[in-house]
From Swiss-Prot:
Its main location: cytoplasm. It comes from Campylobacter jejuni subsp. jejuni serotype O:23/36 (strain 81-176). Pathway: Cell wall biogenesis; peptidoglycan biosynthesis. This is UDP-N-acetylmuramoylalanine--D-glutamate ligase. It comes from the Bacteria. Belongs to the MurCDEF family.
Length: 402
């Protein structure tokens, strides 16, 4: 059986490295490969022009591999890593949505690791590196993965709210939503799907539990929010994690949940040498995440760094939302001019900075002790950085130099 891997990302590299003895050598296709070479394990590294669909039995893409790529268009036996590993996948919980996937996955694993749960997927560990004998896989599941998945399904599907994101990849918001909901048609009567109320009528055999907001979800599962130390925008993530625990174990471990430590890059607060507040929210790459951040600091004047790769999303609603705040904007990245245009139409004051270091320095000229400087860019980072984490790291380095 000849397996072709599309893209040389974390997912496909893990398959190539961990399964070469069982299924390899693999043919790995990536636009960065100009000449045919072999890696140290004997896998072939090939240019996409060399792909012959008649000589390939299975094609597995990296999750973010675009549907319009010529390899995807030519493939006849395409399947996601979820489909590829489904036959050995233990019971699983899939967590998706636009914002909060990572935090909810980490919180749920924190609550359930004592029963042998492990986490992976979009967060940290590819499926090829997960223990197939673990009691439970808790998988952060992206819309990219769901787009390519047609066989695998979880025992529990926890869907957080959906808002516009990755539209240039999916083609439209409706396509994005449909990919998020696609797994429901494969679930059966023994499975559970937790869904925003707006999607409550989506056909599925699974037992559906719909919710309107974090308060409603808490009521549905008998969760006392007063016992949870996390506040919005992380409260919904915490409630969802407890809901998953409730379904599986019929317990609610508030103390264990409250011992969870948030990861960096999400509303990460730091002070400069003048005791002024700066917030690293580099992971806020869409409008709903930025709205949540703005609401958190609504009682302060906000100096917002915004911009980057906007992924083809119309951010007009976000800028209309900003009219409710005492706010000044600092535009960066490839979308600088677009951000300035949005700001002008919304009658918001904005500075043309283009690069992050200049934005930090400009804010420093205006920021007062009772105000907040917020990096919550509403855009991806790859126009100027290798990752959102690198963007956050550079932001903190700039602040520490003040």
């Amino acid at each position: 059986m000849k397996i072709s891997l599309f893209g040389y990302g974390k997912t496909t590299r893990a398959i190539a490295e961990n399964l070469v003895d069982k299924f390899g050598p693999f043919d790995i296709y990536d636009d960065h490969f100009i000449e045919t070479k072999k890696d140290t394990l004997g896998n072939l590294l090939l240019n996409p022009n060399d792909f012959d669909d008649n000589l390939s039995d299975i094609e597995i893409p990296s999750p973010g591999f675009p549907p319009k790529h010529k390899l995807i268009q030519k493939a006849k036996n395409l399947q996601s890593e979820y489909d590829f590993f489904y036959d050995i996948m233990p019971k699983s919980v899939w967590i998706s949505g636009t914002n909060g996937k990572t935090t909810t996955t980490q919180m749920a694993t924190h609550l359930l690791s004592h029963i042998g749960a492990v986490m992976g997927g979009n967060v940290g560990t590819p499926l090829a590196e997960l223990d197939p004998y673990a009691k439970l896989w808790i998988l952060e599941t992206s819309s990219f993965t769901l787009h390519y998945t047609h066989k695998a399904k979880p025992e529990i599907y926890a869907l957080l709210p959906i808002s516009p994101d990755h539209l240039s990849w999916h083609g439209s918001f409706d396509n994005y939503v449909q990919d998020k909901l696609s797994v429901l048609k494969r679930m059966n009567e023994c499975d559970v799907a937790i869904l925003p109320k707006i999607y409550a009528n989506t056909p599925t055999k699974a037992h559906k539990i719909s919710y309107e907001d974090e308060k409603d979800l808490a009521v549905k599962f008998g969760i006392d929010t007063e016992k949870i130390s996390f506040k919005s925008p992380f409260l919904l993530d915490a409630i969802m994690a407890l809901a998953i625990e409730k379904i599986l174990l019929d317990t609610l471990s508030y103390e264990l949940l409250n011992s969870f430590v948030m990861e960096k890059n999400k509303l990460e607060e730091l002070k400069d040498s003048q005791n002024r507040l700066w917030v690293n929210d580099t992971k806020a790459t869409n409008e709903s995440a930025v709205m949540a951040a703005l609401n958190r600091y609504k009682d302060k004047k906000i100096h917002l760094i915004i911009g980057g790769d906007d992924k083809g999303v119309d951010l007009s609603n976000l800028f209309d939302f900003m009219k409710n705040f005492n706010i000044e904007l600092y535009a960066i990245g490839i979308s600088t001019e677009k951000m300035l245009d949005y700001a002008k139409k919304a009658n918001l004051k904005a500075y043309k900075c283009e690069v992050l270091s200049k934005a930090v320095n400009e804010i420093s000229n205006h920021l007062r002790v009772n105000e907040v400087a917020l990096l919550s860019p509403a855009c991806a980072s790859l126009d100027q950085f290798n990752s959102y984490a690198e963007r956050g790291k550079v932001f903190k380095e700039c602040v520490n130099k003040i």
